[in-house]
Amino acid sequence: MEVEDSGGVVLTAYHSYARAQPPNAESRCAPRAAASHPLSRKSIPRCRRINRMLSNESLHPPAFSRSNSEASVDSASMEDFWREIESIKDSSMGGQEEPPPAEVTPVDEGELEAEWLQDVGLSTLISGDEEEDGKALLSTLTRTQAAAVQKRYHTYTQTMRKKDKQSIRDVRDIFGVSESPPRDTCGNHTNQLDGTKEERELPRVIKTSGSMPDDASLNSTTLSDASQDKEGSFAVPRSDSVAILETIPVLPVHSNGSPEPGQPVQNAISDDDFLEKNIPPEAEELSFEVSYSEMVTEALKRNKLKKSEIKKEDYVLTKFNVQKTRFGLTEAGDLSAEDMKKIRHLSLIELTAFFDAFGIQLKRNKTEKVKGRDNGIFGVPLTVLLDGDRKKDPGVKVPLVLQKFFEKVEESGLESEGIFRLSGCTAKVKQYREELDAKFNADKFKWDKMCHREAAVMLKAFFRELPTSLFPVEYIPAFISLMERGPHVKVQFQALHLMVMALPDANRDAAQALMTFFNKVIANESKNRMSLWNISTVMAPNLFFSRSKHSDYEELLLANTAAHIIRLMLKYQKILWKVPSFLITQVRRMNEATMLLKKQLPSVRKLLRRKTLERETASPKTSKVLQKSPSARRMSDVPEGVIRVHAPLLSKVSMAIQLNNQTKAKDILAKFQYENSHGSSECIKIQNQRLYEIGGNIGEHCLDPDAYILDVYRINPQAEWVIKPQQSS
């Protein structure tokens, strides 16, 4: 291949499209592979890009690293990775000294569990404060989620007792379990799931009915209802700091907010025959209605999980068809900030329970935190950049400078060969960096003089120099362990889906914008020679990094997994940022429980100790109390089954609409468009607006145009309905 003069631009790598011969088994060893590479591994920068956080079980070659037909990561494919590492070293801007590798600080397990409890919104279990949010969160947990919380709280209390000899609330005060300590749900899943039902039954958990009680049920509750029967499963808490709504086995959460009555767990779970298939079918159905951890736990019990080999070719990644329920699908940006905070907490609990089912524990090591800059562009936290940008544009979700990088590459670089393998002109990149730091926030930087090659280089540097990695590197070892067990790509997707939902808002929005942008680059692969695999390999050291020490083999293993995670994100970008409906259901229950707890009535305290399961089976109307309560319609003169929709920005600002089983959100929008079709400006306005569900058991919810409104109305009859513009990034 002839390389033409490119104005000082160095082509750092070129991907060969010829199929590489699979090397022998010895080539799996990272040091051997590194030795064969022309670049000395000693030249890798001191600021290592992948974290050293492997468990002992992860120190052998992963099952996904090779298939019978082709190596998933052969030496030719990894050239992009090693050359990117070398390019990172060579492009140290302005002669800046790389910080030395951070030492991993050993911490006791109790401290890690305390941090985890804080991260999932259960800091009240540590502080002892009486807050409704923590109580409401506990009231919504599924069986597997509660087992995950129970295990970590038990570890925390045991560690604190040994360390400080202080009185700490017993785990039984929260979960109402028997005198025996909680079983290890994070051990080997084979051992966990073997044995009799009595030996292996998961701990019982707290639960709310999912609806607000009426006055009658409040007044009829007595303290005697909360008494523990010697042979029963309920225990009166010895501490009132955490409200126990009920201690019963919980069925999988469905999107309609109620479990299948009288059905065993395994019958309530959707068909999982896909787990037995080694060869991915052309397309598979994907449901967001059932808790992933519950689903995989039942699959493991029935030995349904089979290994699935991961190959290099893009087409082997399964195509998923998402099952759209009558509630439609919800993007992460369609919910209010407060509700998304609850989604993050629930997602981390669910992710932990998901890995627990496989005997994998999310472990963290404490490293020295890097404080970001408070001005400029590079090395500044995303939240700081957004705070400054929102002074110019209050609705912005992705930093403006990042959007500018995208635009610059899209203008003329989408068809440029090797666009993200080019190192660019070092002198120009250094100059533009300094000017961006000094002039961008004042809107004085001249973007027209920047070439797309320099924009691509600085885009990578932007993410690489963030104070903390865009994606949490502590998840990679757990993902490696999951891959070693070789589950189907669907299981990998579920783990990744929860990881994305657990990201902070700024990271999640930036990651979504980045994956959307890279898919535009991949769409021009025939001209730019940047395939799905090329992008994932080049970006792995830029998106997953840490300044911790690590070995060569660990670096290669983690790099392979990071590249695979990016590959999955790119492949499933359109559905990864959809919020699982079972999590939205739990948020609704949390909000209902919070409203209930805020009443601060003695009768409410009694209700919290009532046997919910008996009440639901004995009185079917209880599950629909919220819908039938007179107070639910007291504040409005609108008849049952009729909603009043408000459109404050349109000429016709309000309309009463009779709902039926076929009324969709887009039908209501069409009706308003017809009523406001007097001028072209009104038509344009309605086309850019969406129907929102506001209040009741949700903060704010931008509804899917295909959502059936009568179904939404039935689970949230106290909501207000507003047509307004959808928030953009």
Curated annotation (Swiss-Prot):
GO terms for molecular function: GTPase activator activity. Coiled coil: none annotated. GO terms for biological process: negative regulation of stress fiber assembly; regulation of actin filament polymerization; regulation of small GTPase mediated signal transduction; signal transduction. Residues 80-89, 195-204 have a biased composition (Basic and acidic residues). GO terms for cellular component: cell junction; cytoplasm; cytosol; nucleoplasm. The record marks 421 as: Arginine finger. It comes from the Eukaryota. Expressed in testis. Expressed at moderate level in kidney and ovary, and weakly expressed in spleen and skeletal muscle. The keyword Phosphoprotein applies. PROSITE patterns: RHOGAP. The modification Phosphoserine is found at residue 72. Keywords: GTPase activation, Phosphoprotein. Residues 380-577 form the Rho-GAP domain. InterPro entries: Rho_GTPase_activation_prot (IPR008936), RhoGAP_dom (IPR000198). Residues 65-75, 217-226, 619-630 have a biased composition (Polar residues). Residues 20-42, 55-105, 176-236, 612-631 are annotated as: Disordered. The modification Phosphothreonine is found at residue 159. GTPase activator for the Rho-type GTPases by converting them to an inactive GDP-bound state. This is Rho GTPase-activating protein 28.
